[in-house]
């Protein structure tokens, strides 16, 4: 999730300030958002790329477990992680091969949701309307 990505980044930034991400947020860890990490990664920041790679492994593991159990035809990445686009989709797709039985990957479609960071709250509101 975007919040776990931010928490991991905050912990790592306490130990390593020599990167573009730290400069982009002017050292203010409390202001860090997932979007900052994705933007820095797009600018070539290896620190941010490593964070995305780390998070994509956990997402692939979770998605792989779902695929192995219920085998859906489509997975939608939404919320704050959807802001990453291909930066998160490509590593997830690659890592799914490690965590998923091959038949579950045959007809799988992975998409990025269009609701962005507000997907969860909009879904919750829709349930009550």
Locate each region found by the language model:
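ATP-binding/phosphotransfer module of carbohydrate and carboxylate kinases, centering on a glycine-rich
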Residues: 1-129
């Amino acid at each position: 999730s975007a919040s776990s990505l931010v928490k991991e980044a905050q912990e790592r930034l306490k130990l390593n300030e020599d990167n573009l991400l730290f400069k982009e947020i002017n050292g203010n860890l409390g202001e860090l958002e997932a979007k900052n990490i994705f933007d820095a990664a797009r600018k070539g920041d290896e620190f941010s790329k490593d964070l995305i790679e780390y998070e994509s492994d956990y997402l692939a593991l979770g998605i792989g477990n779902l695929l192995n159990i219920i085998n859906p035809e489509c997975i939608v990445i939404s919320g704050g992680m959807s802001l990453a686009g291909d930066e998160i989709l490509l590593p997830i797709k690659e890592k799914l091969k490690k965590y998923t039985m091959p038949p579950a990957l045959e007809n799988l479609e992975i998409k990025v949701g269009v609701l962005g960071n507000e997907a969860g709250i909009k879904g919750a509101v829709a349930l009550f309307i």
